[in-house]
Amino acid sequence: MATGKIVQVIGAVVDVEFPQDAVPKVYDALEVTNGNERLVLEVQQQLGGGIVRTIAMGSSDGLRRGLPVADLEHPIEVPVGKATLGRIMNVLGQPIDMKGDIGEEERWAIHRAAPSYEELSSSQELLETGIKVIDLMCPFAKGGKVGLFGGAGVGKTVNMMELIRNIAIEHSGYSVFAGVGERTREGNDFYHEMTDSNVLDKVSLVYGQMNEPPGNRLRVALTGLTMAEKFRDEGRDVLLFVDNIYRYTLAGTEVSALLGRMPSAVGYQPTLAEEMGVLQERITSTKTGSITSVQAVYVPADDLTDPSPATTFAHLDATVVLSRQIASLGIYPAVDPLDSTSRQLDPLVVGQEHYDTARGVQSILQRYQELKDIIAILGMDELSEEDKLVVARARKIQRFLSQPFFVAEVFTGAPGKYVSLKDTIRGFKGIMEGEYDHLPEQAFYMVGSIDEAVEKAKKL
């Protein structure tokens, strides 16, 4: 094990000098012992003359020139496998939940090659989430990538938790949650909500919060991804949640200038597309299993042409847009059915009936949107009979898109519902074809399948 010494410290970037014949490789982990604290550095560049430039995975406070640095001769390695379930870990895979050692049987390096072309699975299989609006309007593909766009308080976290719960219970799948540059409070809330919903033993949590140095936030997504890859290679369907993918990019921006790179557009790192690609290309399905990822996306200043969200868009198969307008109507999940899209919504993938139903629902809701102004000024009576029918059906559809969640039982008091895709299509098709025109619209609010709406109408 070669030993070097620190020659320069600039914020999170540390230069270390090694003997010429023992220079560490790029991405190797180095270790500094400073008092009783151990700090891990990751090699980013070889500057020549035995000097390497590294990023610190923790705070570089208290480092000084001349401190000895050991080369671990391998990249950062983290625990993988079932031992990680129900635990909270940091970027290095160390437990931060005060529950003792992880007790893992295996450790994997966080830098891995994406699966080769031959290993990739080409089947376009749908992942049934049991959430009506998602299954109908923006279906997820097994091994697909989903962007969850939404402001504060419209339900990103609750939607994520419901997805984790449904995958865990209905599909006996595992989930990995990577909190990248998250608020510590949110991470804490999330952990306790997972415990209360009894799904903690099906999910591994990896956190690198906002207060951590950029090196930590830049690598924590890879730590979570590595754990997900292990489950995939065991033949499982895994869900990988990344919250927030924008902060992964931001961490790269923070260290880029310190590493001596010229900034590109809007001050982002010149390697933006490549860094995003390295992460996203590993999130994929192979012939053994699949990784389906749900990524929360923050859009700076609501500008979708900003380089960061624009680069993210290129990789997504589906976008789920949460709308404050819909949330204010009391309709949860507050997914906007007209704004959310999916590459899977294609008759060749989902079948003609599903496609026609989804497009029919969209056209009715779109027509209702256009008629709203007329209704606001002149009232319902001025509409033609045909338009009155469209409005009545649109309002039923709007309410039928809501659904009680299992993870929200605590505060809604309504038992959660999982709705199969078959029942979802049957329900919306029936409303569109006028089979339920005689039922009052409140019968459709917060129910599971259409049969429940019919039962509810009898009690009203």
From Swiss-Prot:
Q: Which Pfam families does its entry note?
A: ATP-synt_ab, ATP-synt_ab_N, ATP-synt_VA_C
Q: What is its EC number?
A: 7.1.2.2
Q: Which reaction does it catalyse?
A: ATP + H2O + 4 H(+)(in) = ADP + phosphate + 5 H(+)(out)
Describe the function of this protein: Produces ATP from ADP in the presence of a proton gradient across the membrane. The catalytic sites are hosted primarily by the beta subunits.
What family does the entry list? Belongs to the ATPase alpha/beta chains family.
Membrane-protein topology = Peripheral membrane protein
Output the lineage of the source organism: Bacteria, Pseudomonadati, Pseudomonadota, Gammaproteobacteria, Enterobacterales
Leader sequence range is none
**Record protein name field:** ATP synthase subunit beta
Task: Note the SMART domains from the entry.
Answer: AAA (SM00382)
Binding partners and assembly:
F-type ATPases have 2 components, CF(1) - the catalytic core - and CF(0) - the membrane proton channel. CF(1) has five subunits: alpha(3), beta(3), gamma(1), delta(1), epsilon(1). CF(0) has three main subunits: a(1), b(2) and c(9-12). The alpha and beta chains form an alternating ring which encloses part of the gamma chain. CF(1) is attached to CF(0) by a central stalk formed by the gamma and epsilon chains, while a peripheral stalk is formed by the delta and b chains.
What is the native source organism of this protein?
Cronobacter sakazakii (strain ATCC BAA-894)
List keywords of the entry alphabetically: ATP synthesis, ATP-binding, Cell inner membrane, Cell membrane, CF(1), Hydrogen ion transport, Ion transport, Membrane, Nucleotide-binding, Translocase, Transport
Q: Where does ATP bind?
A: G150, G151, A152, G153, V154, G155, K156, T157
State where it is primarily located. membrane
One GO cellular component this record assigns the protein to is: plasma membrane
Q: Does the keyword Translocase apply?
A: yes
Output one GO MF annotation. Answer: proton-transporting ATP synthase activity, rotational mechanism
Query: Which cell locations does it reside in?
Result: Cell inner membrane
Please give the PANTHER family that the UniProt record associates with this protein.
ATP SYNTHASE, ATP SYNTHASE SUBUNIT BETA, MITOCHONDRIAL
